[in-house]
Amino acid sequence: MDVRQRTEEIERLTLAPWATFSDASRGRVRPEEQDPIRPVFQRDRDRIIHCKAFRRLKQKTQVFLSPEGDLYRTRLTHTLEVAQIARTIARALRLNEDLTEAISLAHDLGHMPFGHAGESALDKLCPEGFRHYMQSLRVVDKLEKDGRGLNLTWEVRNGIVTHTKGTWAATPEGRIVRMADQIAFVNHDIEDAVRAGVLDPATLPRECTAVLGETKSQRITTMINSILRSSEGDVQVGAEENEAFLALKDFMYRTVYVDRSAKKEEQKVEKVLTELYEYYLTHIEQMSNFYLQLAYQEGRDRAVTDYISGMSDEFAIRTFEDVFVPRKWHVL
């Protein structure tokens, strides 16, 4: 018996009956030999951490576009906070932490530069529309490793495409990530909004803070405890906490996410991405051979969408300047 098999045996002895067991995975698109040390979901987690798309998250916007200061969240810090909350819940419920962490780390790999403003802009441009969760799946299936993809397990791939609105994940670990994503972004967006001066913490709805808590730590702890109390055979949150949380999220959408200063920047985002999109449609030779091949196989729109969606905020701005902003030149 090798290390992996011993780990799988420990899972069978210690995890809850409704957990997703590594040795019962539905497998990968392309079958592979088992690793002698790591179970399948741990291998997925490792592949995600080492992929290029994961590294790009450090320079992609969470909510505030190009904020001044080092303390604001990026898409990477958001991802790590989701993973922390999700793993805490998974461990307490005796579910599969490796699967939970893998889904958490991959759930936003397909996010555009400039956050949801970028997603909205590309959704208008792309004939097929654009949804970051579907792009996240495309990243791990098709775009990483020069077109070979990461060949992740079915369970992780399912968790990626179901972490937001729509169909619930097929595994309890995937459903944990969906809840952890919501808990993380609402609470850290409150903190960032206060730091940015667009939100006074005293204006948070009293009916929400009375249930969830006054601080970020209190609110996260309240939601985690509610899930732990309410989940037996399925992942759920208590009715009172859920109602307060939804009201708090609605408050954030009505106040912070529609802030006028943020909206002005979003107009600039749409212009930058529109100009880049239209430029590369007619100058596909400016993209790498990998994207040229994609254009040949799946069409120019698809290839340009993949190329732009993979850009970091800084790379998109720098590319826009290189293409459209005149440079000084010297005459001898």
Describe the role of every protein-language-model region.
Residues 99-125:
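Aspartate-rich (DDxxD/NDxxD/DxxxD) Mg2+/diphosphate-binding motifs
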